[in-house]
């Protein structure tokens, strides 16, 4: 079972990825993890990627595709894999297809932008312990204070509303077109495409996913 998970940052992909991995015994493949592992192992592709990154440049799609092919040929991918954060663009999706990397299921978790902003910009963290709160969904007993120590809570830079909106804008510009792309691939009978409402409870989304991934 070869799966691509699409959705904006904060849509809940990580939670559902965990469910899919546990339920179906397939690994989650993240391009970041893959790059780090290849560089550490000193593989030919890893050495090439290190050279590019050391020069402060972006790793090319061809190099990433090479790493993906290398990774999915490993033993733990025999039953399939879950691609996380890749492809991000249509050229990357085209390159995957050109390299014979077929996908069985494309899953989109759809959450409106304003809901994502509410979810992410409402997070508060206690820097000392890493305890996480949410002003709406899991508020501290005293506003702005950690329940245990009474110390001030902070907003992580990634959760600042302006940062969240920037990340959403990049998603809509680069990755959202993949929804239409894979819709066409599915219409041609080459994959299955399913969209889920990510504003539902985690359990409801997992249940619907399981019914599609039988």
Swiss-Prot record:
Keywords: ATP-binding, Cytoplasm, Kinase, Nucleotide biosynthesis, Nucleotide-binding, Transferase
Keyword Nucleotide-binding (UniProt): yes
GO biological process entries: AMP salvage
The gene coding this protein: adk
UniProt name for this protein: Adenylate kinase
GO MF term list: adenylate kinase activity; ATP binding
Main location: cytoplasm
Subunit architecture: Monomer.
Upper taxonomic lineage: Bacteria, Pseudomonadati, Pseudomonadota, Gammaproteobacteria, Alteromonadales
Binding annotation for AMP: 31, 36, 57-59, 85-88, 92, 156, 167
Record-stated family: Belongs to the adenylate kinase family.
UniProt keyword Chaperone, yes or no: no
Record localization: Cytoplasm
HAMAP family: Adenylate_kinase_Adk
Domain characteristics, as noted in the entry: Consists of three domains, a large central CORE domain and two small peripheral domains, NMPbind and LID, which undergo movements during catalysis. The LID domain closes over the site of phosphoryl transfer upon ATP binding. Assembling and dissambling the active center during each catalytic cycle provides an effective means to prevent ATP hydrolysis.
Annotated segments matching region LID: 122-159
GO cellular component, one term: cytoplasm
Pathway noted in the entry: Purine metabolism; AMP biosynthesis via salvage pathway; AMP from ADP: step 1/1
Alphabetical list of NCBIfam families matching this protein: adk, PRK00279.1-1, PRK00279.1-2, PRK00279.1-3, PRK14527.1
Function as written in the Swiss-Prot or TrEMBL entry: Catalyzes the reversible transfer of the terminal phosphate group between ATP and AMP. Plays an important role in cellular energy homeostasis and in adenine nucleotide metabolism.
EC code(s) of this entry: 2.7.4.3
PANTHER family found in the cross-reference section: NUCLEOTIDE KINASE
